[in-house]
Regions:
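A composition/biophysics-driven feature that prefers long, compositionally simple stretches
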Residues: 1-187
Length: 187
């Protein structure tokens, strides 16, 4: 695609990219290659929502607690171990975007993606707090109790970008640049 863009558009043209649909690494590689060819990148307009007017709603499966007898460790214990690794990596915040990582850390399962026991969510773990960004309609009383027991707060799925923007300037955030989208990275 990069080669086609460079050949077809030529220097001085602009390529619009939806930053929610490209990883950090993917964006940086694309940006480097296109800038070298004299092309610009524009990420400020969600053109997908503008043209895809009959887009299906987000999946709404209910979250289910994956019992720790099956996974061997409580969510609280996993968070403690994760915070130790974060400190070793000199990070005081971790943004989780991979759905399987979120399911494993929070001991939750769902059916939002066919043939994968995951929920559409984000996780934001700091040295003191953990927040699961998820549609609140997915949370049963059992799931809320499970998360409360582990000290995990919940927030609406759509609040992740404002939460990232509100972090202090000196926050050291760890992300997986292969899995995290560029829009969250920019937030």
């Amino acid at each position: 695609i990069n080669q086609w863009l460079k050949t077809t558009l030529g220097a001085g043209k602009t390529v619009a990219i939806n930053p929610d649909m490209i990883s950090i690494n993917g964006y940086k590689a694309l940006e480097s290659e296109l800038k070298a060819a004299g092309l610009n990148i524009y990420t400020e307009f969600d053109f997908i929502n503008a043209i895809w007017t009959d887009r299906p709603a987000m999946p709404q499966s209910k979250a289910v607690v994956f019992d720790e007898t099956h996974c061997g460790q409580s969510t609280a214990d996993k968070l403690t171990a994760l915070r130790t690794r974060m400190a070793d990596a000199n990070a005081n915040t971790l943004l989780l975007t991979a759905l399987d990582d979120i399911a494993l850390l929070f001991n939750l399962r769902g059916a939002d993606i066919d043939y994968n026991p995951v929920l559409i969510a984000f996780g934001l773990i700091t040295d003191k707090d953990a927040t699961l960004f998820i549609n609140p309609d997915k949370l049963t009383d059992e799931v809320r109790a499970h998360l409360d027991k582990a000290g995990v707060k919940t927030a609406d799925y759509t609040e992740v970008k404002p939460a990232l923007s509100a972090l202090a300037a000196n926050t050291r955030i760890a992300v997986d640049p292969v899995k995290c989208n560029y829009a969250l990275y920019k937030a």
